């Protein structure tokens, strides 16, 4: 393991030190914590990783609805029983042995990958020769090819280096990352530059001054300067050649309850009360209508989503009744005569996070519950969540593929931390229903099981379902061929560098 880590770091140390002549694409990005595919835990990690590596499969840049595409490998041949997948190598600089080695790292006990859940259904994996990988599953898995398109399925060479479109040439932690294109491509960006800029006002000013080509999300504070009352882009920005791109995402955002916590874990009525106290109209207003209030874990547009109203949606009178039934009438703990105090841990103390956290506290205040806010750095926050050292925590899940399973896996007991089930929710009935869905032979049968899974999660409330994101991005006229996507990992390779006259 120690040698493997040394090789991984050494591979980046050998990246080309010289810059290439040509255009540079600059955007801000939240802190990247790792460039190791097996250890990646955030979309920010994924965006950097997919510039340097190629996943087993990719997602077609242009196709809508979203569709898989070849990447390191061609699309697989699948056996009639749906258990065996054969992948032919497509990247001449990689071998089948590289693929097997990279995927095996996900389930290595030495690495303890947070993405090991991806490989739990794999019975065997082997390189039949240099050009062919065979993966056999324990049972049918209709979404397995989508797992092979995730950044965690990125393929490393033996020395830890990648064969993606770019190579990392500079990484100033918490400040800047610079990537140079391995092979120059006429009309495309030769350099990609990620900047860590915490202050949203600074991000906005840098974009207006042309110091950034792309703004990945228009902040709440700047929304009125971007979009007029008619819902259209401000004419002054249009005159500068700026374009607004708005699409629904597959992001589900939530406040999680640590189910191992002695206060919130065993008290379902308390969790239901806090859900009912969450003021969705006020939350949507806070975000200037740039979000979709959530009614469960699955975003709109995903097949198998439960469409009935959430029984613990905002209802202050119901919340007051439930908090009393939970043993805290008016938020008071009868055993102490004092108010119930809960702690919400949030990663990164940005202005938006502070203000939105205070808003949540005001919601709980209306049923007598005091909410204290604790802020940590992103790395420390993830560690605290994975180790169960939080009570309530605010986080989200960015869908890896458009399937209900991708969101409902967040509640399966086999995926407890450090897997994606960060709340450590355990419900044997849910697990059984989930497993039946995976074994279903038809989409109709599978969706019935997904509906039952969602009904259980809605009743147990291991989350406060806060919202689903919309993507509202801006490009300057320096960027061409930009197609907004929920799978925007490594897509900078397709952008065209435009000269502004």
What residue spans do the PLM features occupy?
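Long beta-strand-rich cores associated with HINT superfamily self-processing modules
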Residues: 473-501
């Amino acid at each position: 393991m120690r040698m493997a880590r040394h090789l991984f770091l050494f591979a980046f140390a050998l990246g080309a030190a010289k810059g290439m002549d040509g255009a540079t694409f600059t955007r801000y990005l939240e802190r990247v914590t790792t460039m190791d595919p097996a250890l990646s835990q955030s979309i920010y990690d994924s965006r950097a990783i997919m510039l340097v590596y190629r996943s087993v499969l990719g997602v077609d840049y242009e196709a809508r609805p979203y569709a898989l595409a070849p990447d390191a490998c061609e699309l697989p041949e699948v056996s009639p029983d749906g258990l065996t997948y054969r992948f032919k190598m497509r990247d001449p600089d990689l071998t089948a042995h590289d693929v097997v080695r990279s995927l095996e790292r996900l389930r290595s006990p030495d690495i303890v990958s947070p993405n090991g859940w991806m490989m739990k259904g794999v019975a065997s994996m082997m390189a039949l020769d240099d050009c062919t990988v065979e993966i056999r599953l324990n049972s049918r898995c209709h979404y397995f090819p989508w797992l092979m398109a995730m950044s965690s399925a990125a393929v490393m060479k033996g020395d830890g280096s990648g064969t993606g479109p770019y190579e990392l040439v500079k990484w100033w932690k918490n400040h800047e990352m610079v990537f140079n294109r391995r092979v120059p491509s006429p009309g495309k960006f030769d350099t990609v530059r990620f900047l860590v800029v915490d202050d949203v006002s600074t991000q906005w000013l840098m974009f207006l001054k042309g110091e950034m080509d792309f703004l990945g999300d228009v902040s709440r504070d700047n929304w009125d300067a971007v979009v007029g009352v008619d819902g259209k882009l401000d004419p002054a920005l249009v005159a500068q050649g700026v374009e607004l791109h708005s699409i629904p995402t597959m992001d589900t955002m939530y406040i999680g309850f640590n189910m191992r916590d002695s206060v919130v874990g065993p008290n379902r009525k308390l969790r239901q009360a806090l859900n009912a106290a969450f003021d969705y109209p006020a939350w949507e207003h806070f975000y200037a209508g740039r979000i979709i209030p959530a009614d469960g874990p699955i975003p709109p547009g995903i097949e198998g989503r439960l469409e009935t109203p959430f029984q613990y949606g905002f209802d202050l009178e119901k919340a007051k009744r439930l908090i009393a039934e939970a043993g805290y009438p008016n938020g008071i703990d009868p055993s102490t005569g004092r108010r119930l105090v809960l702690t919400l841990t949030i990663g990164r103390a940005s202005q938006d996070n502070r203000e939105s956290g205070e808003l949540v506290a005001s919601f709980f205040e209306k049923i007598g519950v005091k909410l204290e806010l604790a802020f940590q750095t992103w790395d420390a926050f993830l560690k605290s969540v994975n180790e169960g050292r939080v009570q309530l925590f605010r986080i989200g899940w960015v869908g890896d593929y458009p399937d209900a399973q991708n969101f409902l896996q967040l509640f399966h007991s086999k995926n407890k931390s450090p897997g994606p089930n960060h709340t450590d929710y355990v419900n044997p009935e849910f697990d059984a229903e989930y497993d039946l869905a995976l074994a279903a032979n038809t989409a109709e049968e599978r969706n019935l099981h997904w509906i039952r899974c969602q009904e259980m999660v809605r009743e147990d409330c291991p989350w406060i379902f806060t919202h689903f994101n919309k993507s509202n991005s801006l490009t300057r006229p320096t960027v061409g061929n930009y197609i907004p996507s929920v799978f925007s990992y490594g897509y900078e390779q397709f952008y065209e560098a435009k000269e502004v006259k």
